[in-house]
Amino acid sequence: MDFNLLTDSEARSPALSLSDSGTPQHDHSCKGQEHSDTEKSQQNQTDDSNPEDGILKKKQRRQRTHFTSQQLQELEATFQRNRYPDMSTREEIAVWTNLTEARVRVWFKNRRAKWRKRERNQQAELCKNSFGAQFNGLMQPYDDMYSGYSYNNWATKGLATSPLSAKSFQFFNSMNVSPLSSQPMFSPPNSIASMTMTSSMVPSAVTGVPGSSLNNLGNINNLNSPSLTSAVSASACPYASTASPYMYRDTCNSSLASLRLKAKQHANFTYPAVQTPASNLSPCQYAVDRPV
């Protein structure tokens, strides 16, 4: 009967185990654990190295290109001639300036953005300087010009008040023009008032002019009556000037004045007395004087 004897070193090692037949066999489970531990350590090392590589790549992307004065001069000269160079032109510039084509392309892109921004700012400044001062001089703020007008204050204003006459407008003052003319409006002409006459002064025997029409025309004296003046002032616009309004002098009033002047001159004019034949002559004498 054969017995498998183990040495002391084999008996102490946990990797060996006895089979049913008694032959020593190596334990593979311990070896698998050792391999898994080594693989995990290698993966951890690779994971630690990956973030470092990513950081290095990001730092490389964020690097700024420092151009020399000669390179900038060449790039600026090309940009003045052509703001959108094609691929071949960019490659030529890259050869001249000792740069890569990608850096030249990025430089032109940034330079165009800077140029567009400067153009917008210049246009805004030009519009502000050219038109802003003119509009500010002509147009005053709304609250300053119309501070006297507010909502729901029409009932407090009297009919005789004149806020426009007391209100001064800077635009009209600069032009020496008042918003409402100081010349009286709707006032009868003084020439008509001075030449008006009563119906008793107008002769009824004026040829071509009936006396009734002259009497009707004589009623123009009533224009200066107090009742008419009060009526005009009461019906006047509450925002008009306190001065009497102005009336347009048409040709009808002037012709009326000339007609009255002619009538007055005709009344003062006296015809020479006509010598009538002597009434003491008899009819016989008339017959004798007549030629046969």
UniProtKB/Swiss-Prot annotation:
Protein name, UniProt field: Pituitary homeobox 3
Lineage of the organism: Eukaryota, Metazoa, Chordata, Craniata, Vertebrata
Sequence motif: OAR, positions: 254-267
Main location: nucleus
GO MF annotations in UniProt: DNA-binding transcription factor activity, RNA polymerase II-specific; RNA polymerase II cis-regulatory region sequence-specific DNA binding
Intervals of motif Nuclear localization signal: 260-264
Known DNA-binding region: 60-119
PROSITE patterns named in the record: HOMEOBOX_1 (PS00027), HOMEOBOX_2 (PS50071), OAR (PS50803)
Compartments it resides in: Nucleus
Organism annotation: Xenopus laevis (African clawed frog)
Region (Disordered), start-end ranges: 1-55
Family classification: Belongs to the paired homeobox family. Bicoid subfamily.
Keywords associated with the record: Developmental protein, DNA-binding, Homeobox, Nucleus, Transcription, Transcription regulation
Top-rank lineage group of the source organism: Eukaryota
Cited InterPro entries: HD, Homeobox_CS, Homeobox_Pitx/unc30, Homeodomain-like_sf, OAR_dom
Role according to the record: Transcriptional regulator which may play a role in the differentiation and maintenance of meso-diencephalic dopaminergic (mdDA) neurons. May play a role in the normal lens development and differentiation.
Comp. bias intervals (Basic and acidic residues): 25-40
Pfam family membership, one: OAR
One Gene Ontology cellular component annotation held by this UniProt entry: nucleus
GO-annotated biological processes: anatomical structure morphogenesis; regulation of transcription by RNA polymerase II
